[in-house]
């Protein structure tokens, strides 16, 4: 097994915290790629394309294994982005009230030695409880989820917004599906345990 530098193609502190759970040394790099969706592109295709483009844009040394990841949430077949403002966050939460929304997380692992990329898309469904406007406002004021797809942080107080969760890996909901990442790393000969 070659000694690869592990690179996380993300500046997200949430993804960094998740990856740190694996107890593997890694560095981070800011990806440089156009995130504009293509006309008619499905969420799955968009996220796999973006994850791969991010990973391929960030290798820092030879040899490197570069992790790229991207995420969106979808409600009623519409991609919901990061709210960026308090009003937009409250609006998103009220739209999601009583609904099931699906999170799509694209994951890519690029080996710069072989130029091969493993790419996949993981899904996770969140069932929201019925929310009043005052509940949504109190939550947004308390946690400021303005840079989070779906306007919540499931790893914090956001858990109070849900009736139930459906998915294989709760880390996927935060933006980095570790169970699947471990499989991709092992495919490259890097064993986590």
Swiss-Prot record:
Gene3D superfamilies with a match to the protein in the record: 3.90.950.10
The organism's place on the tree of life at top rank: Bacteria
Alphabetic keyword roster: Cytoplasm, Hydrolase, Nucleotide metabolism
Reaction catalyzed: N(7)-methyl-GTP + H2O = N(7)-methyl-GMP + diphosphate + H(+)
Site residues, Important for substrate specificity: 14, 71, 155
GO molecular-function terms, A-Z: nucleoside triphosphate diphosphatase activity
Gene Ontology BP annotations: nucleotide metabolic process
Predominant subcellular localization, coarse grouping: cytoplasm
Disulfide bonds listed in the record: none
A GO-annotated cellular component: cytoplasm
Active site: residue positions: 70
InterPro entries: ITPase-like_fam (IPR029001), Maf-like (IPR003697)
Subcellular localization: Cytoplasm
EC numbers: 3.6.1.-
Cofactor(s) required, per the database record: a divalent metal cation
Family to which this protein belongs: Belongs to the Maf family. YceF subfamily.
Protein task: Nucleoside triphosphate pyrophosphatase that hydrolyzes 7-methyl-GTP (m(7)GTP). May have a dual role in cell division arrest and in preventing the incorporation of modified nucleotides into cellular nucleic acids.
Protein name as it appears in the record: 7-methyl-GTP pyrophosphatase
Organism for this UniProt entry: Vibrio cholerae serotype O1 (strain ATCC 39315 / El Tor Inaba N16961)
